[in-house]
Amino acid sequence: MLGFGILLTGCGRKKSSFSIGADVSFVPQSEARGVIYQDENGVPKDIFRIMADHHFDNIRLRIFVNPEAEKGYSPKQGFCDLQHTVDLAKRIKAAGMKFTLDFHYSDTWADPDKQYKPSAWEGKTGEALESALYAYTKSVLTTLREEGIAPQMVQIGNEINHGLVWPEGYIDDNAKEANWITMLGIYKAGQRAVREVLPKTQLMIHLALGGENTLCHQYLDYMIKNGAEFDVIGLSYYEQWHETYNDLKTNLYDLSAYYNKPVCVCEYGANKDNIKIINDIVRSVPNGLGYGTMAWEPAQTLFTSVDGSMQGRMPQPGQEGQVFKLNASSEIFGIYDAIYAQYIDPKFISDVEPPFVRTVENSDQIIGADISWVPSQEDKGTKFSDKGVQKDVLEILKDNHFNYIRLRLFVDPTSENGYSKEGYCGLEQTLAMAKRVKAAGMKFLLDFHYSDTWADPGKQFIPASWERFNGSGLEGQVYRYTHETIKKFIAEGARPDMVQIGNEINHGMLWPQGKIGESYMPFGVMLRCASAGVRAADPSILIMVHIACGGQNEESVAFFDKIISRDVKFDVIGESYYPKWHGTLDDLKNNLTDLANRYGKPLIVVEYQDYRKEVNDIVKNLPNGLGWGTFIWEATSPRWGDLFDGSGKTNDNMAIYSTLNY
């Protein structure tokens, strides 16, 4: 260990070309509220020297135009203004580190949910707005240059995948050429100021699209087309919003190769489980184009409270006058020390598997049934039988050629306006039923409703326990709930073979935020979060997107064109087909045939009631073997699936399935 210490300390310390960075713009606020940063031995030191001692070499600072404005970030103390930035940048430079400046072009936070125009620029549009942004950018950079603390890298905006300086610079999925030109005109005003004042400083474009390759290409291609420049591609990556690690890896590898630019994960939420994973992924980018990473506000992870009073968090307002001593965490800093020790060897190859491509396969034609009502029926005394012999309902279905069972899941059916005070279709009831499905040797499709009760084209009520969430908070909750639920099923031995991320969602989900209006953008983010939640738990589980448009081709195409353009990752197209809403059998056949030819994805009629043989035959005969099968809805209900009578006995309709010799 002595030799290791000598290698990494002292004047002769080797340097890695890979940058280990962080955004710690909260530091002045923490220190103003009494925080004292200490090294592992409890010796007070400047936080930047502590970080530099552990191989951090690049610190990013955000800057707001006027945080003291009425609706600004820090009306009383002006944190993240120019003066605070100057003072902090001097400390960064004194610690021997590089400095990245992150222009938010707002008086407060700017991110994909919001890009508020600074109060000083209200009323400005067009060239006047561009001139204001140019003058502000030039003034800030000139000040930093004259103070001897010019940044090595500059971001023209923060997480600007939906544009910057709204409303003029706003872009969404319906953005026209003129919208892009306006937004990029604003961007180029900042670009011009950077190039004039600091011609050697790198420009980093910052998009909150860690795993969204399609959207990254769309954005960067528009930039190039309109003369907007970038030297480094910077991406935010937070697991709950930006897809899986494999998606991140795939995106970084592709973007670096396609644009021949370095790539940087310039925001991630560092924790002991993901630091090495994310850094190794970026370090593994071919041709040395993995620039590095920047952990976002990691002080609460890097430091621990000596007395437990803070547990590493920033003190809250009202705690002024107190002293909080935070010691450097040997565990977390040790992770960074270890990866640095590996990265200084230019021949070191990160232990990262190449990006993998999902394979979509199905061995048998699906003859499926939704039997989510069964636990309620059984609790009320229903005994199921076939040809006079009483059997478990799953055995009866299997005897009649059924091989796949669909079960719906509500978030909390016992809530005030929920589906069932007894908890039917809740997690525990659904899990118990799923175990029975697996024990019967059948496959299992899990149908997330993302509601406490029925979700369909006419209603998509947000769960009661989620009403406190909005914006990115609700999107993150979709990911967490999906991910945790799938992990629970897997841990209990009831792994779903396929998952629906929403039920009949052609009008959106989780209303009002996820309701489809003129824009699919909020809904698209939710759907991406749901998909990522499944794939992060088990990348081999098939993902279905389910709409209720069995015979409506125009609506089906419009929907799937949009979600594909919004980078939603899914494997199977699911359609409901009820003749009174979805047209004739010819309408169904024509729609499914077109979808198969157009998208090349497997299709399943995941809900139907009538025309049992005809629907199955239509799906079976779709082009290129893409008709995977069907699920009859509520097979045990005399009113719906009607394969059993009210007493639980099979009826003549069941015999149809024995004739489906697929």
Where are these regions (language model features)?
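N-terminal substrate-binding region of glycoside hydrolase catalytic domains
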Residues: 15-87, 91-98, 106-132, 353-432, ...
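C-terminal motif of bacterial Sec signal peptides marking the signal peptidase cleavage site
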Residues: 8-10
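Anion (oxyanion) recognition and catalysis
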Residues: 52, 93, 195, 257, ...
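Hydrophobic faces of well-ordered beta-strands that scaffold small-molecule active sites
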Residues: 20-24, 57-61, 99-103, 152-156, ...
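Active-site beta-loop-alpha junctions enriched in small/polar residues
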Residues: 25-27, 64-66, 104-108, 156-161, ...
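Active-site cleft segment of glycoside hydrolase catalytic domains centered on the general acid/base Glu
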Residues: 75, 80-84, 110-228, 241-251, ...
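Bacterial N-terminal signal peptides
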Residues: 1-6
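Aromatic-rich peripheral "rim/lid" segments of glycoside hydrolase catalytic domains that contact
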Residues: 32-33, 254-260, 272-361, 587-590, ...
